[in-house]
Amino acid sequence: MMFGIGIVLFALAILVSVALHECGHMWVARATGMKVRRYFVGFGPTLWSTRRANRLGSTEYGIKAIPLGGFCDIAGMTSVDEIAPEDRPYAMYKQKVWKRVAVLFAGPAMNFVIGLVLIYGIAIVWGLPNLHQPTTAIVGETGCVAPQITLEEMGECTGPGPAALAGIQAGDEIVKVGDTEVKDFAGMAAAVRKLDGPTRIEFKRDGRVMDTVVDVTPTQRFTSADASAPSTVGAIGVSAVPVQPPAQYNPITAVPATFAFTGDLAVELGKSLAKIPTKIGALVEAIGGGERDKETPISVVGASIIGGETVDAGLWVAFWFFLAQLNFVLGAINLVPLLPFDGGHIAVATYEKIRNMIRSARGMVAAGPVNYLKLMPATYVVLAVVAGYMLLTVTADLVNPLSIFQ
């Protein structure tokens, strides 16, 4: 029940984010003297609309049947758009370049503002996590190897454990167990569990790669939460670096913390976005039944499923944090300098400005607006790529969705 409610809530949150994105365009367009003819949430047949007068004429507001986005129709966005004679003085393509760029940037800027507001709220209510938690197999502590009595209870042991006796210390990063290279603590533990007896282990200390022989000790462990009895597995007596709890803030200290955290988050999101083109093969493999790579991109469908999981688990902080990340990503993607994205229109306006500055320096008159009809073939290519990628991600999210618990 809560899972379904969570899906609906997150889908609505995405729709509100898109609607506010379009509001950003509309508000700045009006403020800079451009006429907004229509503002709609959704696509397809109109369910409801109303027209309201303003100082530049009137604007039609409405809701359409397919809640997968929205649009803000500004008169004369390009020189090839149809425009009524009375709207020509307010046409967007006739305005100064800085005004056009401001209108185009206002949409993505609204997404960034939404993300910042959400991060600020999270900082005050729940605190902000450390984005640089150790992800590799770094040793937090060494100790003796105790058997596991029950799922909640460990047995007793004394003295140093196998890892400590072999010279491994807290802070060392284990990179190889026997012939198995390990990337994280879970992978290291899984490799050790399969072993028994002296094993060569490589680790990094102060940037240097070292190795030692550790006598892997057999012990009793419950290997899964639903196991009825413990199994005999190998252990070396090391534990992971504990996860740092979220840092707490008040309404004042949360302001600089929000910007600092968002800067770190932007770097991590940028790394993820840069990997998108390399994940096509992983998406195809996931659709075919392979394991879904947790770094593969998701669609609105996948995002809503994850939103549903967070609500079902009562993880409201994860719900809002995921929505904040999504808004940052939406804003960044819309600034890609390719048509039909906002960034593509900004690139065209910037090109016109630079071109006319050069012409003016040469004593020539300013040239006319860029002919968007000549740019349509390239625009269609971008649309085809985006549509294909969306189809791929939606299919993967339906047949093999990502989960926050995997």
Swiss-Prot record:
UniProt GO MF annotations: metal ion binding; metalloendopeptidase activity
Lineage: Bacteria, Bacillati, Actinomycetota, Actinomycetes, Mycobacteriales
Amino acids binding Zn(2+): H21, H25, D206
Family in the record: Belongs to the peptidase M50B family.
EC number: 3.4.24.-
Chain's role: A probable intramembrane site-2 protease (S2P) that cleaves type-2 transmembrane proteins within their membrane-spanning domains. Degrades PbpB (PBP3, FtsI) under conditions of oxidatives stress; degradation is inhibited by Wag31-PbpB interaction. Also cleaves anti-sigma factors RskA, RslA and RslM. Site-1 proteases have not yet been identified in this organism.
Regulation: Proteolysis is inhibited by Wag31; when Wag31 is non-functional oxidative stress increases proteolysis.
Residue ranges constituting the PDZ domain according to the UniProt record: 125-209
Transmembrane segments: 1-21, 108-128, 327-349, 375-395
Class of this enzyme: hydrolase
Membrane topology, record value: Multi-pass membrane protein
Disruption phenotype: Not essential. No degradation of PbpB (PBP3, FtsI) in the presence of mutant Wag31 upon H(2)O(2) exposure. Altered processing of anti-sigma factors RskA, RslA and RslM.
Localization per Swiss-Prot or TrEMBL: Cell membrane
Entry protein name: Zinc metalloprotease Rip1
Catalytic-site annotation from UniProt: E22
InterPro entries the UniProt entry points to: PDZ_6, PDZ_sf, Pept_M50_Zn, Peptidase_M50
